[in-house]
């Protein structure tokens, strides 16, 4: 499969993902409320995983979590580090959860987007934090959908871009498979 990025178009991260900020979880909480639910913070080691906690505890504490596959991005520390969590996770205050719409979310699409987002990591080097406004307005280049006649498909609702481009989710999935 050819990877011709010259035809890719720019999309704001906020138009592709729903972004959720984490809330403070301590190591003590993880130890005292042990479980099977993955806790992600800002480190790169172990894919950002800090430990495992009881999922019900996370719900009671109103922590930010996803039961479905998602990406996480470190806000500080290893700022900009993106990890894929196939079984969902809860994030502490040093991380964010990035979710795709259910109809397009697949492990393969998440893996593709993880790689694309990781290419932007340099923007958060030298102590620059991943702030919400900065990350929401960050742009990534993605393959776009085409009509049968070879012209770019344009979405009148402009859900993903102000120009009407639509990411080619199927292409991303096939590329990873």
What are these regions (language model features)?
Residues 31-32, 65, 131-133:
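Intrinsically disordered, low-complexity regulatory regions enriched in Ser/Pro/Gly/Thr
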Residues 94-95, 113-159:
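Glycine-anchored helix-breaking recognition loops at helix->coil/strand junctions
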Residues 51-118:
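A short beta-sheet element
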Residues 6, 14, 74, 101, ...:
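A structural detector for beta-sheet-dominated domains
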Residues 6-13, 39-40, 70-72, 83-84, ...:
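General detector of folded, globular domains
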Residues 59, 110, 130-132, 170-177:
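Extended intrinsically disordered, low-complexity coil regions enriched in Ser, Thr, Gly, Ala
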Residues 1-24, 31-48, 150-177:
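Non-catalytic DNA-recognition/assembly elements of restriction-modification systems
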Residues 41-44, 77, 102, 144:
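Short, flexible loop/turn elements at secondary-structure junctions
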